[in-house]
Amino acid sequence: PTYWQLGVNWASKDYDPYQVPEYKAWATEDYYKSGYAEMLDVYMTGLYYSFITKDDVDKATGVVGQRSEAGMDNSLTYCYSVEGGAEIAKHITRGVVPVIGSIYVEQYLGDFTPFGPAVTQALKSTDGVMIFDIVHLNKHKLWEELEAAMKAAE
């Protein structure tokens, strides 16, 4: 919900943010016309978040985790979790394009414990997963974790 600041509107033209009260501050009445989901074959959404589930956000005590992507802020909102980010992407693309959840391996540098659950959540919440990037799987020897996470999503 903050990428509009960067001029990005990968939503479907059927999604009108002007109808969402908290978005009226930035969305114009015609903003929905700039949505381009219908022109995509696939949309890969970056789910580069420390929180995996919306429940994790609810349990947070003010520590937001790594937030280095453009357009991010420090709020404790569901959009900053793998589950919540995927939910928003699916909602605003309106089913006109497959949504693939992208997981950045080094988001979990220092503690790879959440990597597997992030992959599992991305697979459960979207139409597939893209791991960014294979070099990190090799470097950190995470192939077994990836396999287990993919099986857990079945």
PLM segments and residue spans:
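Glycoside hydrolase catalytic-domain groove-lining segments
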Residues: 1-110
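Aromatic-rich peripheral "rim/lid" segments of glycoside hydrolase catalytic domains that contact
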Residues: 110-128, 132-154
